[in-house]
Amino acid sequence: MTAIDPIRLAAALLLVLLASAAARSQETETDIWRKVREGQFAGRSFEPGADQVITLEAPNRAEDAAVVPILIHAVQSQQPQRFIKKIYLVIDKNPSPMGAVFTLTPDSGRADIETRIRIEDYSWVRAIAEMQDGKLYMATRYVKASGGCSAPAGKDMESAMARLGKMKFRTDGGVQLGEPNLAELMISHPNVSGLAMDQVTRLYAPPRFVRTVQVSYAGKTVMSADVDFTISENPNFRFYFVPRADGELKAEVVDSSNATFETSVAIRSGAGAGS
């Protein structure tokens, strides 16, 4: 039997990996993405090594296209000298491909964002990190889902409107000062896309959805978001913040009808929070 040359084997494996990466890069270059990139990131390039900056978790096939869980994970913590300034969420095949733009600061501690989204058709989902120095890094996942944006909202719209704008904060365990703490913001809102037909009246319900979210701690912004109906009914966001001392965690939300909602919770070292 002829001995296998380890150098040739390594070279062959490297060529296979490079070819696979090139094929994947071409595969993700859809016409819609090219238009979004030219409109939002014209003249800017994407840096290599994105998996050392940002990752994206999403199911390969969604159980419910109107409620698809995603987790955007920042590999490194937020430091004043190097941090993720913005995260762009793009779903190529959605009616509104640029579904969300999250703005973060060093006071976020970590730039992780977890939420639930609607996906209208089989699509590439993209999480793009913009660093404080302007460099761009992109993570992608292909998700098989259909009909999420045109699916009707909850069955009882009257009850949903009665709860409109009610919000609640929750933290996991006792809050640790000077450390990134995970918090969750739950918003009661039908987030009507305007794309779902009423099967009885055959009419489309007018759109009404959350447009902006701003979360601050002790008066300093830790996370803000410009969003649309890409976010699922009853928007839910999990994010981090770093409390330097006891203070107030506050959320201000505005929807597409210019209705404004607020909630806040007192944060005390060692105690959990729930508003």
State each model region's role.
Residues 1-11:
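Bacterial N-terminal signal peptides that target proteins for export
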Residues 20-25:
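Sec/Tat signal peptide C-region and signal peptidase I cleavage site
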Residues 38-65, 159-177:
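N-terminal edge beta-strand
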Residues 107-114, 229-238:
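Aromatic sugar-binding surface patches on proteins
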Residues 120-124, 180, 244-248:
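Extracellular Ig-like/FN3 beta-sandwich strand-entry sites
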